[in-house]
């Protein structure tokens, strides 16, 4: 059965390989299953996040081992998460293994250095992760990606490394990150500080196809057509439908929208709109109306 992560590898794929290896090697019983999630460092939850993000289904605890973002309903993007994602993964894997692991114990630990690989699955390309994360605002996926950036930069895969890791990755772009504070990969922390101009400059790189940023452009939700913008830019703003490509943002203290506008007159505009404070859902409509005005104005607004 497909989860929200379409065509991703499944535990059953791994279990089939393990059972095949066991059959070929005369193994009839698995006594112990050890779950190694040490790729990511603790804590699994950022101190400034509200636990309602977890119980209401917007964010899982950040562990390197979990199944379908630890969703109660793997087919629903927004679905309650638990406080035991690693243990849940172990439970599901034991079940997938079937009779051979019926009496196996399951515990968390670290992979021994002399271990032999008997089965493996590989994730989809990171480009697929990025596109899905952008389309539906998958917070868990965003946290994973941030930690992979940290690992690539030679840092620990932890909340404490994300700020430096992202700034280090942005160095070649020449974007000025002075004053930028990044507490997490998902943007859920209200202690993050990223000025709108920083996002606008980033979107300029996306528009121009800097490095491999084209994957970001391909993943941006489209006004009234896809992802988190599929139900927005209707009514009086319908003329902007299909012409605004942008990432949505929402926490209790703000709504944001940042991206690219293919304006009515053909001009490409980069924008970032923040509505901060004690905001209501109606702020999204106001943001959309302002972005639509940008679309209509086109080159009159361009500062280049």
Identify the function of each model-found stretch.
Residues 56, 71-217:
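A small/polar active-site loop signature that marks catalytic segments
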Residues 1, 38-40, 51-52, 68-72, ...:
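Solvent-exposed coil/turn segments that connect beta secondary-structure elements
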Residues 32-35, 64-66, 132, 141-144, ...:
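Structural recognition of the beta-strand scaffold that forms the well-ordered cores
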Residues 35-46, 50, 103-116, 222-224:
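Short, glycine/proline-biased beta-turn/loop segments that scaffold the active-site neighborhood
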Residues 150-304:
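Small-residue-rich helix-loop
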Residues 29-31, 59-63, 102, 141, ...:
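Envelope-exposed proteins and targeting segments
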Residues 54-56, 83, 247-251:
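Short Gly/Pro-enriched turn/cap motifs at secondary-structure boundaries
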């Amino acid at each position: 059965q497909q989860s929200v992560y379409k065509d991703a590898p499944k535990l059953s794929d791994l279990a089939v390989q393990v059972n095949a290896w066991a059959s070929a090697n005369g193994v009839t019983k698995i006594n112990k299953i050890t779950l190694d999630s040490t790729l990511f460092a603790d804590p699994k939850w950022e101190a400034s996040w509200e636990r309602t993000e977890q119980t209401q289904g917007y964010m899982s605890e950040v562990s390197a081992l979990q199944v379908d973002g630890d969703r109660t309903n793997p087919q629903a993007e927004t679905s309650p998460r638990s406080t035991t994602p690693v243990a849940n993964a172990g439970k599901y894997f034991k079940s997938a293994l079937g009779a051979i692991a019926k009496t196996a114990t399951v515990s968390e630990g670290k992979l021994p250095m002399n271990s032999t690989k008997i089965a493996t699955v590989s994730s989809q390309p990171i480009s697929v992760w990025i596109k899905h994360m952008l389309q539906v605002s998958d917070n868990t996926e965003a946290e994973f990606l941030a930690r992979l950036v940290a690992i690539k930069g030679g840092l620990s895969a932890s909340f404490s490394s994300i700020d430096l890791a992202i700034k280090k990755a942005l160095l070649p772009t020449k974007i000025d990150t002075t004053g930028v504070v990044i507490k997490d990969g998902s943007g859920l922390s209200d202690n993050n500080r990223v000025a709108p101009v920083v996002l606008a400059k980033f979107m300029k790189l996306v528009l121009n196809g800097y490095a491999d940023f084209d994957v970001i452009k391909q993943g941006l939700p489209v006004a009234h057509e896809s992802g988190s913008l599929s139900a927005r830019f209707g009514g009086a703003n319908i003329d902007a439908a299909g012409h605004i490509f942008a990432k949505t943002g929402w926490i209790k203290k703000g709504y944001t929208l940042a991206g690219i506008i293919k304006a009515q007159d053909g001009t490409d505009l980069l924008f970032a709109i923040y509505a901060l404070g004690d905001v209501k859902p109606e702020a999204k409509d106001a943001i959309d109306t302002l972005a639509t005005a940008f679309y209509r104005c086109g080159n009159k607004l361009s500062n280049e």
